[in-house]
A protein has these predicted regions:
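Oxidoreductase cofactor-interface core, primarily capturing Rossmann-like NAD(P)-dependent enzymes
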Residues: 38-44, 51-76, 86-87, 91
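Hydrophobic alpha-helix immediately C-terminal to the catalytic Tyr-X-X-X-Lys motif of short-chain
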Residues: 26, 30, 34, 65, ...
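Catalytic helix-loop patch of NAD(P)-dependent Rossmann-fold dehydrogenases
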Residues: 2-43, 48-49, 54
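Glycine-rich, phosphate-binding/catalytic loops in enzymes
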Residues: 7-11, 59-61, 94, 131
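C-terminal substrate-binding subdomain of Rossmann-fold SDR/epimerase-dehydratase oxidoreductases
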Residues: 72-73, 77-205
Length: 205
C-alpha cells in the first residue's frame, strides 16, 4: 500500500490495496502458520521485476517504459513522483538460488524484502531515456494512482550477506538488445506479454 516512511522493512504493518497484494499476504500467513520441524516456510517479498526473460512480461514499469521508448520514441509518465522499487530478473533468480542452499534453521519463518533500487517513476523514465536515446520525449500525465513505497533490503544484505549484481540500466539494455535482435516481436499487441490479457484469454479472470 501507500507508505510515508523512508524505508519499509519486513516487520512494518501491511496495508494491501489490491486484491493481488491481499491474496499474497494471506498466503504468507497461511504458510507461516504451518511452520514446524518438518516444514520451514520462508517468505521473499520481491520488488517489481525488470529486464529480459524467456517468458517476457511487458506490463511491468521499467519494461513498459523501455518498450515505449524503443518503439514509439516517447515515454508517457503517469504522475511521476511515486516510488517504485525494482529488482533485475537475474538478481531475482539469484535470490531464489541463494536461499535454496541456505541453512533451513536460520531461514525458517523469516521474511525478507528483495529489491535494490527505489526510484520514482520520473527517475525511471530518465534512466530509460539515457540508455535508449536521449532524444526521446517524456510526456507527463496526471494520475490518481498514488501507490508509492520505498523498501529496504538491508536485512537480506546484512543478515544473509546477499549482494545484488544488476541495475535498472542493465535491465533496460538487456531489453534493448532483445528488441534489436528480434527476440521480442509485436510487443504491443501480443497478449503473451501482458498477464491480465493472457489470463483473460484462458478464462482465468
Amino acid at each position: 500500500g501507500v507508505k510515508e516512511k523512508s524505508n519499509v522493512i519486513e516487520t512494518d504493518s501491511t496495508h494491501p490495496i489490491t486484491d493481488y497484494s491481499k491474496f499474497k499476504l494471506n498466503c504468507e500467513k497461511i504458510l507461516l502458520s504451518y511452520k514446524n520441524k518438518n516444514f520451514c516456510p520462508f517468505i521473499v517479498r520481491p520488488a517489481t521485476v525488470c529486464g529480459y526473460s524467456r517468458r517476457q512480461r511487458l506490463d511491468l514499469i521499467v519494461n513498459i517504459l523501455t518498450n515505449f521508448a524503443f518503439h514509439k520514441k516517447v515515454i508517457n509518465v503517469f504522475g511521476g513522483d511515486q516510488l517504485r522499487p525494482n529488482i533485475h530478473i537475474k538478481d531475482m533468480i539469484r535470490v531464489y538460488e541463494f536461499f535454496i542452499k541456505e541453512d533451513l534453521d536460520k531461514m525458517s519463518g523469516d521474511i525478507v524484502n528483495a529489491g535494490i533500487e527505489n526510484n520514482s517513476v520520473n527517475e525511471l523514465a530518465e534512466i530509460v531515456k539515457k540508455n535508449i536515446d536521449n532524444k526521446i520525449e517524456i510526456k507527463r500525465v496526471p494520475t490518481d494512482d498514488n501507490r508509492s513505497y520505498h523498501i529496504s533490503s538491508k536485512k537480506l544484505i546484512k543478515d544473509y550477506n546477499f549482494q545484488f549484481n544488476h541495475t535498472i540500466s542493465d535491465a533496460v539494455n538487456d531489453l534493448k538488445n532483445a528488441f534489436d535482435t528480434g527476440k521480442l516481436k509485436n510487443t504491443f499487441n501480443d497478449d503473451k506479454f501482458f498477464n491480465v490479457k493472457l489470463m483473460q484469454n484462458i478464462n482465468l479472470i
